[in-house]
Design a protein with these regions (language model features):
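Hydrophobic pocket-lining "lid/loop/helix" segments that shape and contact the acyl-thioester
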Residues: 1-78
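Buried hydrophobic packing segments
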Residues: 32-33, 89-96
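Short Gly/Pro-enriched loop/turn and capping motifs at secondary-structure junctions
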Residues: 56-58, 82, 115-117
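Active-site-adjacent helical/loop segments in soluble small-molecule enzymes
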Residues: 77-89
Length: 126
């Protein structure tokens, strides 16, 4: 095994196809957002914030365009912290709360995607 690692080190490194992840996220995230809203009898117009995994700005902008929802409803902080993996949504939610951007009764969609091309979404009322 160790000898194989020396001969073929590329097989033992983490790799990511950024273009494939972008295409995946832009296709799956809007679909799962629509699905979670439908299951909760809500429309996009009733949602105050859509908080996505903070992978990169291009994905957030593309999801905003695809859903035809103003980018202002998609808070972002990746410019401050980068991609913090599974912590990105909780960090942004906490930051918004500390900055008093979240108000009682607001409806929020949380949508994540990541390793292994997994994805999911939930709706909460603040």
């Amino acid at each position: 095994e160790k000898e194989n690692q020396k001969q073929h080190p590329e097989e033992y490194k983490m790799q990511m196809d950024g273009q494939a992840v972008f295409k995946f996220a832009v296709r799956q995230v809007p679909a799962v957002i629509k699905e979670v809203l439908e299951k909760n009898n809500l429309s996009l117009e009733e949602i105050d914030w859509i908080i996505l995994h903070q992978a990169n700005r291009r994905i957030v902008e593309a999801v905003s365009r695809y859903l035809n929802v103003p980018l202002e409803k998609f808070p972002m902080n990746m410019q401050e912290y980068g991609n913090t993996s599974s912590a990105s949504i909780p960090i942004l939610l906490d930051e918004m709360n500390r900055n008093q951007r979240l108000k009682k009764g607001q409806k929020i969609v949380l949508a994540g995607f990541g390793a292994g091309l997994t994805w999911g979404a939930s709706v909460l009322e603040w």
